[in-house]
């Protein structure tokens, strides 16, 4: 509210059963509200009352109150229409996705993005951290992921025009910065779900550690867009260990219930010709069909 009005509101706790002074905005918890993220916002001539079943609900009600105030009003007094809003989410999962793999965004932009999610009562931030075009999260056991994988030498101009800007581009987040984002989101009742896309979309990782690909490379951090045949070698024990190690560090950074692992656009071209992959397929009796993935259909 202070962002919209320029006024910093004083806050104080009310004793149970006491009445707030006239002109106050009163926040409270009401277990009778049916949805844990629901709230009731009531505007009367002399006061505003906002109750939620949980702190989450109160927070979402505050966002509605914020949006009732004219943007950047900086007014000394604000008129709100009298009435009551009883609101609750239709969907328990409400999120948006940010791809920082293809295009890197600095941490301050990520925070602003989270602020906008909060303003619109979103509760999940899907953070797409790895791509063919860049690896964006520090993994301490594999430093080349950010030393090499976070940077591409050039970027295609437009939609795969075969013209390039010949400008080095990239960036990454340290683990401390990622934890800072998790905390920032948590303070706004938003869960961060990280995505490490695999086994496809891994050219940035293969550029850093070419031994994890079926051909052994050389690979480059991809400067263009599309779906590419070089994916993680599933028959290589180093690849399996890599995945375990990376996920162990990701889990330590992100306390979310879910970790997204992509799974899209992974051509099996290399696997079909790779002796190691074919050996694993036979040993573990792995099977698929032509309708196994959208890319095969």
Task: List each language-model region with its residue ranges.
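Conserved, mostly hydrophobic/aromatic
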Residues: 1, 54, 96, 117, ...
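Hydrophobic faces of well-ordered beta-strands that scaffold small-molecule active sites
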Residues: 94-98, 125-127, 185, 192-196, ...
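Active-site groove signature of glycoside hydrolases
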Residues: 198, 217, 228, 243-270
């Amino acid at each position: 509210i202070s962002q919209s009005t320029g006024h910093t509101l004083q806050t104080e706790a009310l004793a149970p059963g006491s009445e707030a002074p006239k002109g106050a905005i009163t926040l409270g918890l009401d277990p009778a509200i049916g949805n844990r993220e629901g709230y009731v916002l009531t505007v009367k001539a002399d006061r505003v009352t906002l109750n939620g079943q949980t702190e989450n609900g109160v927070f979402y009600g505050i966002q509605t109150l914020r949006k009732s105030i004219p943007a950047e009003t900086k007014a000394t007094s604000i008129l709100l229409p009298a009435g009551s809003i009883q609101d609750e989410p239709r969907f328990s999962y409400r999120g948006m996705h940010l791809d920082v793999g293809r295009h890197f965004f600095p941490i301050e932009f990520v925070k602003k993005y989270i602020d906008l999610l909060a303003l619109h009562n979103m509760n999940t931030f899907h953070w797409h951290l790895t791509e063919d075009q860049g690896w964006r999260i520090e993994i301490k056991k594999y430093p080349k992921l950010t030393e090499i994988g976070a940077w591409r030498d050039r970027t295609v101009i437009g939609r795969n025009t075969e013209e390039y800007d010949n400008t080095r581009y990239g960036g990454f987040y340290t683990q401390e910065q990622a934890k800072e984002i998790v905390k920032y989101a948590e303070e706004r009742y938003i869960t961060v779900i990280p995505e490490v896309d695999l086994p496809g979309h891994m050219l940035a990782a293969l550029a850093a550690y070419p031994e994890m690909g079926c051909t052994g490379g050389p690979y480059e951090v991809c400067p263009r867009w599309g779906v590419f045949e070089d994916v993680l070698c599933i028959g290589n024990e180093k690849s399996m260990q890599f995945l375990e190690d990376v996920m162990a560090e990701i889990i330590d950074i992100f306390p979310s219930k879910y970790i997204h692992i992509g799974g899209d656009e992974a051509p099996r071209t290399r696997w079909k010709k790779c002796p190691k992959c074919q050996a694993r397929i036979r040993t573990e009796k792995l099977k698929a069909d032509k309708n196994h993935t959208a890319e095969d259909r």
